[in-house]
Amino acid sequence: MKFRPCIDIHNGKVKQIVGGSLKDQGDQAAENFVSEQDAAFYAELYKKAGLKGGHVILLNGKDSPNYEATKAQALQALGKYPGGLQIGGGICPENAAEYLEAGASHVLVTSYVFKNGVISWENLEKIRNAAGKEHLVLDLSCRKKDGNYYIVTDRWQKFTEEIVTLELMEKLGSYCDEFLVHAVDVEGKAHGVETELAELLGQYTAHPVTYAGGVGSMADIEELRRAGQGRLDVTVGSALDIFGGSIPFEVLAEMK
């Protein structure tokens, strides 16, 4: 299990938000933490700690008046740590190369691939061809409904018809290098991980899988290690001391 850091950017600022609270209308979100530091500061911190494979997420839609400020922050972070960070948020074949050339190791994609509630295999091929399989991470962010974990899109606001299963991951795995999975219902709440989801993800062995959502303590990290059979990497946001939480960054920085 490795620690994968994050830089979440909303309205041009590095923030930690409650995952299910994003609303495109008015660019609103329930905030846990708003940093006085810029995205490049965190990129430099992760670089110095030798942490690779973290992700930068743009939390504004392309139609937002704040999108350009958010994108500018993201590009600064990539420039500070070339090859060390992945990027997601509004990625499509038309802009994937721009982010890779700016220093991203991988691009993260959800909404472009899961169109109108189902997988667009055509779009998946397009983004794989544009970015290259070795630079593509599929973000299977999901929310629980009727006992299943459904993939959600559009900044986690829209449910798709696609359920996270091993079979689905095996099919999608031929197109990508890694998976990132946000457990959106617990994201930003730091009240514990989605154990059932972690147990499912821990059965998948073909590609690296990073779990994000709900980690509030070192006990939660250990629970995730147990549930995921040690196979899952972990992203911690709101619970980290660098984002106003109590888990020391230095402790997790040893997990690499």
Residue ranges and their predicted role:
Residues 55-56, 108-109, 137-139, 180, ...:
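Conserved beta-strand positions in the central sheet of alpha/beta enzyme cores
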Residues 119-130, 221-256:
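C-terminal helical cap(s) of enzyme catalytic domains, especially alpha/beta-barrels
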Residues 8, 46, 54, 87, ...:
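Conserved, mostly hydrophobic/aromatic
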Residues 14, 19-67:
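N-terminal beta-alpha supersecondary unit
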Residues 73-106, 196-234, 250-252:
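Catalytic cores of alpha/beta
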Residues 51-72, 111-117, 181-190:
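Glycine-rich, proline-tolerant flexible connector loops at the mouths of alpha/beta enzymes
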Residues 67-74, 120-125, 161-166, 191-199, ...:
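Charged helix-capping and loop-helix junction motifs
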Residues 10-11, 17-25, 100-186:
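Conserved anion-binding
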